[in-house]
């Protein structure tokens, strides 16, 4: 009696492994970029949460930094997320201001890798900063103090080229 063998040959299995390897070579870097972009977007959400505090600061006449000072009414002008920390800086933003006190927006500095999940931040953005300038209408635009690579900056705040 002859027995028939069934199954895949070695060459067929090697071809499948090679195809999977080629697909992985393209997919893994794209996935890492996707993760970094999604983590960078959290910073803008943190900055959005600071808009009320910025408005309170401007009612008091100036942008106030992150240090809490109950005597002046400053209550910790920062917000910590999972992947980063957003801080209102002492710098006002108004390119048309003629004198101090004419500010209509503050600057927010987001530092990635200073959140509650420091060890889970993508190495592509860890330690990078995104500076946001608040405009008159309350929206944000990218500031000059940004060292976050352009491909990770959310489109909503990206500086027009």
Swiss-Prot record:
Where it sits in the cell: the answer is: Fimbrium; Membrane
Which residues are annotated as pro-peptide in the record?
Answer: 1-7
Spans traversing the lipid bilayer: 8-28
Topology in the lipid bilayer is annotated as: Single-pass membrane protein
Q: Which Pfam families match?
A: N_methyl, Pilin
PTM-bearing positions, type N-methylphenylalanine: 8
Q: List the disulfide bonds.
A: 63-106
| Major subcellular location class | other
What does the entry list under GO cellular component?
membrane; pilus
Please give the biological process terms from Gene Ontology that the record holds: cell adhesion
Q: Which domain of life is it from?
A: Bacteria
- The entry's keywords: Disulfide bond, Fimbrium, Membrane, Methylation, Transmembrane, Transmembrane helix
Q: How does it assemble?
A: The pili are polar flexible filaments of about 5.4 nanometers diameter and 2.5 micrometers average length; they consist of only a single polypeptide chain arranged in a helical configuration of five subunits per turn in the assembled pilus.
Q: Which family does it belong to?
A: Belongs to the N-Me-Phe pilin family.
Per the entry, what this protein does is: Major component of the type IV fimbriae that plays an essential role in twitching motility, natural transformation, and protease secretion.
This chain belongs to the protein called Type IV major fimbrial protein FimA
Its source organism is Dichelobacter nodosus (Bacteroides nodosus)
């Amino acid at each position: 009696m002859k027995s028939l063998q069934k199954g895949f040959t070695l060459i067929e299995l090697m071809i499948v492994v090679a195809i999977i390897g080629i697909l992985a070579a393209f997919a893994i870097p794209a996935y890492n970029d996707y993760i970094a972009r999604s983590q960078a977007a959290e910073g803008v959400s943190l900055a959005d949460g600071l808009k009320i505090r910025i408005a309170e600061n401007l009612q008091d006449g100036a942008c106030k930094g992150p240090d809490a000072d109950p005597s002046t009414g400053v209550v910790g002008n920062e917000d910590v997320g999972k992947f980063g920390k957003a801080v209102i800086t002492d710098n006002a933003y108004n390119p048309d201001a003629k004198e101090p006190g004419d500010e209509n927006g503050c600057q927010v500095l987001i530092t990635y890798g200073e959140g509650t999940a420091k060890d889970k931040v993508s190495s592509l953005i860890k330690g990078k900063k995104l500076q946001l300038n608040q405009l008159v209408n309350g929206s944000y635009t990218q500031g000059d103090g940004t060292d976050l690579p352009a491909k990770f900056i959310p489109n909503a705040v990206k500086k027009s080229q």
